[in-house]
Curated annotation (Swiss-Prot):
GO terms for biological process: signal transduction. Residues 18-91 form a coiled coil. Secreted scaffold protein that plays an essential role in dorsoventral patterning during early development. Stabilizes axial formation by restricting chordin (CHRD) activity on the dorsal side. Acts by facilitating the association between the tolloid proteases and their substrate chordin (CHRD), leading to enhance chordin (CHRD) degradation. Residues 1-17 form the signal peptide. InterPro entries: Olfac-like_dom, Olfactomedin-like_domain. The lineage of its organism: Eukaryota, Metazoa, Chordata, Craniata, Vertebrata. This is Olfactomedin-like protein 3A.
C-alpha cells in the first residue's frame, strides 16, 4: 500500500514537471510570435513612410516638370516672336541698305521711293477705339505724399483696374516699389510697406509705362533698347532697339528722358526727338505685344522748355515750364486724327505746385494724371470734352 502511494507521488511529480515545461515552451513561443509581430509592424510602418515620401517626391517632380514645360513653351513663344521681328528688321535693313547697283539709278525713281515712304508715314491713323475726348481743364489737384528724390515716376497699371501702385525713384535705378492700393501707399512710412521688384537692368530717364501687368522701359546704356518686363513672372519677355538714329532728350527741362512711353485708350505710344527734327517732338504708335513701331508722326511741338507730355485718345499734350519753375501749362497739342487744331486747342494751366514735373502719366481707366513733382506724388483730375473735327 505504501509502495502504491509512493508510485502515485512519483507519477504526480512527473506530470507536474511536464506541465511546467509545456507552459515554459508555450510562453517562449508566444514571446517569439510577439517579437515577430512587433518587427512586422515596424517594417510595415517604415515601408509605408518610405512609400509616402516616394509619392511626395514624385508629385513634386511632376509639378516641377509641368512648370518647366510651361516655361519652355513660353520661352519658345518668345523666341518665335523675336525671330519674326529679326526677320522683319532684316527685311527693313535690306530695303534701306541694299547692295549698290551696277548701273546708274534714275534720280526720279529715287525721289518717287522717298516720297512713298514719307506718304506712308503720313497715312491717316486707323483708330482702335471710338474715343474722342480732349482736355478742357484741370478740375482738381491732390498731393498724396512725398517720397524719393526730385525726379522719378509713379503710376498704376494703365491697362487694368488692379489698383496696384508702382513707385520708380530716380533716373537710373532698377528697383520698383509695388503697393496694393493708393491707400496702402499713402499710409505707409516711405516705401517700407511695398513689395520690391528688382529689374534685370537699370532704367534710363522717367519715361516708363506699366500696361497690362508689364513694365515697358528704356534700358540704361548707349543703345536705345526698349524692355518689356513681366511683373508677375519677373522675367523679360521681349526687347527691341528703338528704330530711330541720333536721338535727343525729348524734353529740354528733363534731359534724362530720351523716350517717354505713354498709355491711352488706343494703347502704347512713344514720345521722342531726333537730330533730324531737333527742334520738335516726334510721336510713334507701338504694338505692346511685339514692340514694333506701327506709325510715326512729326509734331509741331518744340522741345525747348518742355517738361513732360501725355496722350489722351490719340492726342499728345506737351507741358511747358521755364528754367526757373513757374506754372506748368499745356501749350502744344497734336492729334493724330486731325480732329484737334493746335491753334484752337485751349491752353490749360496747372495749379501752382513746388517745381516742375519730371513725369506725367495718364490713366485712361480713371481719367487722372499721375504726376511726380520734386519728390511729391500728385493726382490731377481732368475735365474732358468731345473733340470737334476741324
Amino acid at each position: 500500500m505504501r509502495a502504491l502511494q509512493l508510485l502515485v507521488l512519483v507519477l504526480s511529480g512527473l506530470v507536474g514537471a511536464q506541465q511546467q515545461a509545456l507552459m515554459d515552451y508555450l510562453e517562449r513561443r508566444l514571446l517569439a510570435i510577439e517579437d515577430r509581430i512587433s518587427l512586422w509592424h515596424e517594417q510595415t510602418s517604415r515601408y509605408a513612410s518610405e512609400l509616402r515620401e516616394f509619392k511626395q517626391q514624385m508629385v513634386a517632380q511632376l509639378e516641377g516638370l509641368d512648370k518647366s514645360k510651361e516655361a519652355l513653351r513660353s520661352e519658345l513663344d518668345t523666341v518665335g516672336t523675336r525671330v519674326d521681328r529679326v526677320e522683319r528688321e532684316m527685311d527693313y535693313l535690306e530695303t534701306q541698305n541694299g547692295a549698290q547697283p551696277c548701273v546708274d539709278v534714275d534720280d526720279k525713281l529715287v525721289e518717287q521711293q522717298v516720297t512713298f515712304v514719307k506718304e506712308r508715314n503720313k497715312a491717316k491713323y486707323a483708330k482702335l477705339t471710338d474715343c474722342s475726348d480732349m482736355i478742357s481743364s484741370i478740375k482738381a489737384m491732390k498731393i498724396l505724399k512725398r517720397v524719393g528724390g526730385a525726379k522719378g515716376m509713379w503710376t498704376k497699371d494703365m491697362g487694368s483696374a488692379t489698383g496696384k501702385v508702382y513707385i520708380l525713384n530716380g533716373t537710373d535705378d532698377n528697383t520698383v516699389f509695388e503697393f496694393g492700393t493708393v491707400r496702402e501707399f499713402t499710409s505707409s512710412q516711405g516705401t517700407s510697406g511695398a513689395t520690391t521688384i528688382q529689374l534685370p537692368s537699370a532704367w534710363r530717364g522717367m519715361g516708363h509705362a506699366i500696361y497690362n501687368n508689364h513694365m515697358y522701359y528704356l534700358k540704361q546704356g548707349e543703345e536705345m533698347k526698349l524692355i518689356k518686363f513681366d511683373l508677375q513672372k519677373n522675367i523679360i519677355v521681349d526687347s527691341a532697339v528703338f528704330p530711330v538714329k541720333n536721338q535727343l532728350p525729348v524734353y529740354s527741362l528733363n534731359p534724362e528722358t530720351f523716350i517717354d512711353l505713354a498709355v491711352d485708350e488706343e494703347g502704347l505710344w512713344a514720345i521722342y526727338a531726333t537730330q533730324e527734327n531737333e527742334r520738335h517732338i516726334s510721336l510713334a504708335k507701338i504694338d505692346p505685344k511685339t514692340l514694333d513701331i506701327q506709325q510715326m508722326w512729326d509734331t509741331p511741338c518744340v522741345r525747348e522748355n518742355a517738361e513732360a507730355a501725355f496722350v489722351i485718345c490719340g492726342t499728345v499734350y506737351v507741358v511747358y515750364n521755364s528754367k526757373l519753375p513757374s506754372r506748368s501749362r499745356i501749350q502744344c497739342v497734336f492729334d493724330v486724327s486731325d480732329m484737334v487744331n493746335n491753334d484752337e486747342a485751349p491752353h490749360v494751366y496747372f495749379p501752382k505746385r513746388y517745381g516742375t514735373h519730371s513725369s506725367l502719366k495718364y490713366s485712361p481707366v480713371e481719367q487722372l494724371l499721375y504726376a511726380w513733382d520734386d519728390g511729391y506724388q500728385i493726382l490731377y483730375k481732368l475735365q474732358l470734352k468731345k473733340k470737334l473735327e476741324v
